Amino acid sequence: MRKKTSSNKKNTAKKNNNISLHRKLGLIYKKTILILKIVLIIFICLFAFTKYFASLKSYLKTNIYQTTTELGFKLENVIIEGQQNVDEPTILKVLNAKKGSSIFALNLDEIRNNLKNNRWIKEVYVSRRLPSTIYIKLFEREPIAIWQINNQLFLIDEEGYEISKNIEPFPHLLHVVGEGANIYASKLVNELQKYPALINKTSSAIRCGDRRWDLNLKGGINIKLPAKNFEEALKYIDALNKANKLFNQNYKQLDLRDKNKYYIEKY
């Protein structure tokens, strides 16, 4: 009799455990469904209210722009300063606003960013001058040389930045050639500008091994500059030119790479 009683107790305990587990699973399922319903309701509410507020915001903006325009805050004038190589129609196209439209409807940051997409423009300042003027101050890139690389020609600024492929308006600029020539052109141009007579007779500068320059002068003279302190070599060439001992000596090549000994080759 004792054995049967013990067995019955075990069976009863198992049944109770199974019932408890089912209840727990049922509660978890119900809670999960409830949470999902709440999340869904929140998303529906957010979507509905967002659309409502967006619509309200748009309505208010339209009315504010209309009211301020009637009060005289409308676009009548555009003042542009610093403009040299960027034409006015290009700037006004970026402005994308009709005369008489609300001056507050213009997004100044957007105008500024769009203008900076023009490769000529390094920096730009845009502001409203109430009640009716937009002021644009341009800081354009200044071309210092024409860079030839991979059979292509580019106008470059002092940073080596490729401004434009339209080189025709700048035939007077120094022609620099080779890999890295755009990066190092600024220093060479600045030094050559100290000797106007010399730079005017320099047809091109070739970057050699990304470490030094060869100058090709008019008249077929090639000058090999040293990798370091080429300023002294330029002084020497300018002195020869001033003494009239450069272009009438039948020179083919002047090798100035060794500051202690110059080599001269004639035709």
Curated annotation (Swiss-Prot):
Subcellular location: Cell inner membrane
InterPro entries: Cell_div_FtsQ/DivIB_C, FtsQ, POTRA, POTRA_FtsQ_type
Membrane side Cytoplasmic: residue ranges: 1-32
Coiled-coil intervals: none
UniProt keywords, alphabetically: Cell cycle, Cell division, Cell inner membrane, Cell membrane, Membrane, Transmembrane, Transmembrane helix
Keyword Ligase: no
GO biological process, one term: FtsZ-dependent cytokinesis
Membrane topology (UniProt): Single-pass type II membrane protein
GO cellular component: cell division site; plasma membrane
Function: Essential cell division protein.
Protein family (similarity comment): Belongs to the FtsQ/DivIB family. FtsQ subfamily.
Name the UniProt record assigns to this protein: Cell division protein FtsQ
